Every structure is written in C-alpha cells, then in structure tokens.
Amino acid sequence: MPVQGSQRRLLGSLNSTPTATPRLGLAANQTGARCLEVSIPDGLFLSLGLVSLVENVLVVVAIARNRNLHSPMYCFICCLALSDLLVSGSNMLDTAVILLLEAGALAARAAVVQQLDNVIDVITCSSMLSSLCFLGAIAVDRYISIFYALRYHSIVTLRRARRVVAAIWVASILFSTLFIAYCDHAAVLLCLVVFFLAMLVLMAVLYVHMLARACQHAQGIAQLHKRQRPAHQGVGLKGAATLTILLGIFFLCWGPFFLHLTLIVLCPQHPTCSCIFKNFNLFLTLIICNAIIDPLIYAFRSQELRRTLKKVLLCSW
C-alpha cells in the first residue's frame, strides 16, 4: 500500500541492514521529542496472516462445496473472505520478500523489486477496497431482507449479486491501479479516506435502522402477548450490543490506517504526526486482525456453513 517513503520497505530492503527494535517503547521523532512506537515482530505478523489465510480459505471452500450456500448472501460472504484472504496473503508476501532481501537469501535487481512492489501494492489496495465494498454489500443485503422481506428474492437475485460482485472487483482493481500510479497526490489519499467514511456511514445507518425495526417488532410481539416491557428492553440491549461490536470492530481495525493516510495529507512534517507514522505496521496488523474476525462475524455463525466446514475438515483427514 503506498504511503510515505519510510513505509515503502520493499525497495529499500536492497540496501538496508536490519536492526533490533523493541516490541513497545519510546522512539525519538524528527524533532527529538519522545513518542510511543509499537513494533510488531515479523513472526507475529506472519502468524496472524497465516491464521487469516487459513480461516478465509476454509470459508471459501465450504461455500463452494455446498450448493445450499450458493445464494446472494453467501456469495457476498464468500467474496469478503476472498478479499480478506488476498489482504493477508499480499501482506505476508510483502513481508516474506523483505525478510529474504534483508537476509541476502534473495538476489534481485532494483527494477525487478520495484515491479514486484507495485504488483503487491495493487493486490493489497484492491483487496482492501473490495473488502470494504463487500462489507457494505452484506449490510445492504441484510437491510433488503428485513425491510423488503416479501420481495427479497425478486430484488436480490443470484444474477444481480454476481453482477455486483463483478463490478466491485473490476472497480477495485481499476481504482487501486490508479491510486498506486498517483499515490504521491494528496487527492488520491483523500479519496481513499472519503471512501472509508462513506462505507462507515452506510453501514452505521443501515444497521441502526435494522436495530430500530427489530425493537419495533419485539415491542409488537410483546404487546400481542401482553408481556412486560423488560422483554422488549432486553431485545434492544442485545441488538445494541451486537451493533456496537460489529461497527466498533470495523472502526477500530480500519480507522487507524485511514487516520494515517489523512495525517499524511494534513501534517506530513508535524512531530505528533511523525509519531503516528511510526506505527504504520501496527495499523496493517489491525487490518489483518479484521480479516481474522470477519469470518467469525459473517460466516461461522451459520449452522449450515459450520456443518459443511466440519465435513470438509473430516474428509481432509
């Protein structure tokens, strides 16, 4: 993912000498001030990436193997898993190449490394964009299933879902290529930030509206059966907790990365911003963690998918 020069480690690794860094400590910024820097060990980063990779591969395989899961909803979930898989895989590849170059185990010309860096950046950026898009698509799909339940199967058909999936992938690859080519322009970074905020607002509005409808439905059932108000309050609290977790994880995992991009535009030389820039690898790690959490939220809660996954694992043994 293109950011400022210090983060483009792949090309710089040709002439770099690895130095030991603490996992958590104080580092000096450009003005000599002390700032907090969290260093993520490469082993931990690769381990998290591997967990995400395996987890999302299992989701894709389970959905592909079970024809009962070939529905629009699971189509979006499968594509989300594929996007998260690419996010993890591309970052793992980037880190692995860096380590091999720094150790001298891989010899390559600067031009070759630059091309490889560009390819990895495009894959990473496009998979991030598609991951955000599919999170939004899942929210829209759930919204339609609740507010237009009787017309859902005529509105959200498998053909339309496939068209949406194709459009998301094509747009993600196209825009990520443009973003990488013009990564030095502030407008490009601001476009990415605005896109993230748009997805955040879209998901928040849709899920809050769905929560309000669920509370109204629970209240109607309670009145029909002459139940006490605490039952309705329990539904509201449970829904609010679920909504808080869902949006909270999304914001905490993705927010720091896009804050990083925003500060590159607003205050690239400010001492405080420089301290934040030092934690770029931490922000990437949070995105990898989101790729680990996504299957737990959107995929593994399905009993049908869990049964299919169990069969796949048993057959593999």
From Swiss-Prot:
Transmembrane spans: 38-63, 73-93, 119-140, 164-183, 192-211, 241-266, 280-300
Cytoplasmic compartment residues: 64-72, 141-163, 212-240, 301-317
Gene3D superfamilies: Rhodopsin 7-helix transmembrane proteins
Localization terms from the record: Cell membrane
Lipid tethering residues (S-palmitoyl cysteine): C315
Any single Gene Ontology cellular-component annotation: plasma membrane
Superkingdom of the source species: Eukaryota
GO molecular function, one term: melanocyte-stimulating hormone receptor activity
Keywords: Cell membrane, G-protein coupled receptor, Glycoprotein, Lipoprotein, Membrane, Palmitate, Receptor, Transducer, Transmembrane, Transmembrane helix
Extracellular side: 1-37, 94-118, 184-191, 267-279
Membrane topology: Multi-pass membrane protein
A Pfam family: 7tm_1
The UniProt record lists the keyword Lipoprotein: yes
Quaternary data: Interacts with MGRN1, but does not undergo MGRN1-mediated ubiquitination; this interaction competes with GNAS-binding and thus inhibits agonist-induced cAMP production. Interacts with OPN3; the interaction results in a decrease in MC1R-mediated cAMP signaling and ultimately a decrease in melanin production in melanocytes.
Annotated family: Belongs to the G-protein coupled receptor 1 family.
Protein's name according to its UniProt entry: Melanocyte-stimulating hormone receptor
